[in-house]
């Protein structure tokens, strides 16, 4: 297990990485100690999209998120928009005198929340983005993100459990999770992990 423990104290930290990694450790390392997997299974937790501990380079990675809740009814379309200025990825733009956020490109860093003096983005749900199939070393594989941001910690933990059990049931001895996913197909694995959530 690894976590960006300092994210708890960093301004950008969106989730308590240490507490979550401890819960993951207790539930899955201790709780699943007798479960035999085809190979080691590494889990990393990062507190924000800055990606300090590279969760996407682990078998399963979690990255803290904050999904902005936009109220365009109060947007004044300011020429010097505080939300636009706060967005490090430049995906928030004033168009036709209303703020618009490119939802596909938004990294959910939460930096836009609370910046507007007219309260256009006053809040945002906290969540967890999950990557699967990453690895580092002789063979590098960038993990792929599941097509959902989980706003419930329990739901995110359930996905971890499903991933571990999927690897147990479908992995070949000596095979890393990235290879299992490649062999079976990311879309097939993703579908099974997201079923009944």
Give the positions of each predicted feature.
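Ferredoxin-like iron-sulfur electron-transfer modules
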Residues: 28, 33, 37-40, 58-114, ...
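A gly/ser-rich beta-alpha-beta helix-loop segment of oxidoreductase catalytic cores
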Residues: 35-68, 186-188, 192-194
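Flexible, glycine/charged-enriched surface loops at secondary-structure junctions
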Residues: 34-40, 95, 169-183
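Single conserved hydrophobic/aromatic residue that forms the stacking wall/gate
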Residues: 1-5, 9
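Short, well-ordered, mixed-charge alpha-helical segments that flank or form enzyme active sites
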Residues: 11-12, 49-55, 139-140
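A domain-level signal for the structural core that forms small-molecule/cofactor-binding pockets
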Residues: 50, 61-66, 125, 130-136
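A hydrophobic, small-residue-rich beta->alpha segment in the mid-to-C-terminal subdomain
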Residues: 126, 134-171
């Amino acid at each position: 297990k690894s976590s960006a423990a300092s994210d708890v104290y960093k301004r950008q930290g969106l989730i308590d990485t240490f507490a979550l990694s401890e819960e993951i450790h207790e539930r899955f390392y201790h709780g699943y100690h007798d479960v035999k997997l085809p190979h080691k299974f590494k889990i990393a937790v990062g507190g924000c999209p800055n990606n300090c501990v590279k969760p996407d380079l682990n078998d399963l990675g979690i990255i803290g998120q904050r999904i902005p809740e936009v109220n365009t009814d109060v947007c004044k379309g300011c020429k010097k928009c505080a939300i636009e200025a706060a967005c490090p990825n430049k995906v928030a733009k004033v168009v036709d005198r209303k703020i618009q956020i490119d939802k596909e490109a938004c990294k959910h860093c939460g930096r836009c929340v609370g910046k507007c003096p007219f309260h256009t983005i006053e809040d945002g749900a906290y969540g967890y983005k999950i990557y699967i199939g990453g690895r580092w070393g002789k063979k590098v594989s960038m993990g792929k993100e599941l097509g959902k941001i989980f706003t419930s910690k329990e739901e995110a933990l359930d996905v971890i459990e499903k991933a571990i059990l999927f690897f147990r049931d479908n992995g070949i001895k000596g095979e890393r999770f990235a290879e299992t996913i490649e062999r079976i197909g990311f879309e097939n694995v993703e579908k099974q992990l997201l079923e009944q959530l």
